[in-house]
């Protein structure tokens, strides 16, 4: 890519292609990590209700703003609607809590986290609820169609509280259905993307609809070692011999190669690190030039292995089949 941003439909907002992911940042480290990330140069922060650290993310952001390091308009803040709040009765209440938790006046992008409407869980019972089922033995679904949920997101845009809305972990059919009734078109699709799982057909079709793409889990199984069997057993892309060969050729890290691979496909990326050196390195990817041989090497790693799959968490939900 020749630019450092993706232009979003409808608003024309510039979404940075190099972002910082807030998943799995411990609450005790989160405020300082986000603050340091802003000092390092990050301007997009990707969060979610489900990550359980929105209060701390907000503190880090507001600390940087209050110290004059950045202005709010310099930042692009993303968060997500969790599954248990899909009902039209609960969307706005969760959104308002997320704004309050982060101490912000608006979000730049608000995403539906999964196309999975689960039974409502009162925040007084547990928050964030995750894939909570209480005393039940399986997931409990809510009778809440996506079109009602999306209409509530559109109202949030109308109120000036979210500049853009989009979806995560949606397949082609779910997006196709959404496009038949959406008054405000989704600006972004966020999905798992890496050389093991390039999802070329979905990516091509989504781009043809004018929807931009954010890639998560750019390093493959790294974030899933403690969550799934495939996360434990699959070779880390950061340690893969083929990725190392490309990295050695360009005198960069394997992480930088994987992020550059994504940028070359016009995906925004949201890696996370609490290590200052890696945090800086993950930003320094614009000048890396992968050639045709490099891309052939990386493309050969395709296995279609997905790591963020509710089926592998024991929920019996074949979401991506």
Swiss-Prot record:
Residue positions of the active site: 51 (proton donor)
Protein EC: 1.1.1.-
Pfam name, any one: Aldo_ket_red
UniProt-listed GO biological process terms: trisporic acid biosynthetic process
This protein's UniProt keywords: NADP, Oxidoreductase
Main function: Catalyzes the NADP-dependent oxidation of (+) mating-type specific precursor 4-dihydromethyl-trisporate to methyl-trisporate.
Family: Belongs to the aldo/keto reductase family.
Protein name per Swiss-Prot or TrEMBL: 4-dihydromethyl-trisporate dehydrogenase
């Amino acid at each position: 890519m020749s630019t450092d941003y993706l232009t979003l439909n409808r608003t024309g907002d510039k979404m940075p292609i190099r972002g910082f992911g807030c998943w799995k940042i411990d609450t005790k480290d989160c405020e300082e990590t986000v603050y340091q990330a802003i000092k390092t140069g990050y301007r997009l922060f990707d969060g979610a209700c489900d990550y359980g650290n929105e209060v701390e993310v907000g503190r880090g952001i507001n600390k940087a703003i209050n110290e004059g390091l950045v202005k709010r308009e310099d930042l692009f803040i993303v968060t997500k609607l969790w599954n248990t709040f899909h009902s039209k009765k609960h969307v706005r209440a969760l959104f308002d809590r997320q704004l309050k938790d982060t101490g912000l006046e608006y979000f730049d992008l608000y995403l539906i986290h999964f196309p999975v409407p689960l039974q409502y869980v009162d925040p007084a019972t547990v928050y964030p609820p995750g894939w909570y089922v209480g005393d039940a033995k399986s997931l409990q679904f809510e009778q809440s169609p996506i079109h009602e949920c999306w209409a509530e997101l559109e109202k949030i845009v109308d109120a000036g509280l979210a500049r853009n809305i989009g979806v995560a972990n949606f397949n082609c059919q779910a997006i196709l259905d959404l496009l038949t009734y959406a008054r405000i078109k989704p600006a972004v699709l966020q999905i798992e993307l890496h050389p093991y799982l390039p999802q070329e057909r979905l990516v091509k079709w989504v781009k043809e609809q004018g929807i931009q793409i954010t890639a998560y889990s750019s390093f493959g199984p790294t974030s899933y070692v403690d969550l799934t069997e495939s996360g434990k057993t699959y070779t880390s892309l950061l340690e893969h011999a083929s990725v190392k060969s490309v990295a050695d050729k360009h005198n960069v890290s394997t992480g930088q190669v994987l992020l550059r691979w994504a940028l070359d496909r016009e995906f925004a990326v949201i890696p996370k690190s609490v290590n200052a050196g890696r945090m800086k390195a993950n930003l320094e990817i614009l000048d890396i030039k992968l050639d045709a041989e490099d891309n052939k090497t990386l493309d050969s790693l395709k296995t279609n292995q997905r790591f963020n799959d509710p089926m592998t968490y024991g929920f019996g939900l074949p979401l991506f089949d």
